[in-house]
Amino acid sequence: MRLTPEMVDVERLVGAVREPGTIDIVGDTFAIVQPFTRVPWLEAILGNPVEALIQGGSMRTHRFVDGWEDWHGVTAHRQDAWFRLLMQITELLVERSGGRAATVAPILRGPSDLAEAVLGPELMIYSLYDHPDRMRRFLDEVTDLFTEVHNGLLRRFAPVAGGTVSYFGIWAPGTVVRTQCDASAFLSAKLYRDWFVAYDLRTCEGADTSIIHLHSCSMHTVDALLETPLPHAIQVILEEGPNVPTLRAL
């Protein structure tokens, strides 16, 4: 089912008003609330069709650019209805939290992820060689959008003890940004270094503390990231799978 902004039940997503109080603690982290994170917000704002899979409870985007003429043929590369919806939900979450939970940004995918979502992996990779100027303009545009959306969220968050709580429930002084580069899984270390690390760093510059999310299949990006002062932290998900003896038995 194709999801559009007017189909979203805002009241159901933000929940009831909570009694005011101090922020709750969950284990070693602060309690958080966030705009429904299954919605691929940045991709939707860029114009990606969003498909809601009712039985699986997930949402996916579909690339909508088969060639660069499709991208340049679009008058506006920002869907204001999705942008306004994200900001509205964020404001309501802050208002209704009662200070009991920190409102944080949903998953915001980084420039390489946005390139893969809009262009698809084939056009994305070929364009690094065949259309480098167009690709750089595209990456400039989506990186600027990332920063614009994140700044809009930061302006709406309520500070916690003079700082901000991250997506991971961890407090930091000042402001925090979380970015990611999952699409680096199909990039070589050289392509990531030559093309994408600079754009990831630009997303990190939008806050006082920056975190980048990786999967274990993207560890080849770490050397390039460690050569720069940003991000301040690298968060890695270690994918689990069969051990070597099990694989041999198969």
Language model regions located:
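A gly/proline- and charged-residue-enriched helix-loop-helix capping module
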Residues: I54-E91
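Active-site loop segments of alpha/beta catalytic cores
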Residues: M1-R2, R12-F36, W41-G47, A76-L250
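Conserved oxyanion/phosphate-binding beta-strand-loop segments in alpha/beta enzyme cores
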Residues: G47-I54
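Outer-membrane beta-barrel proteins
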Residues: E6-D9
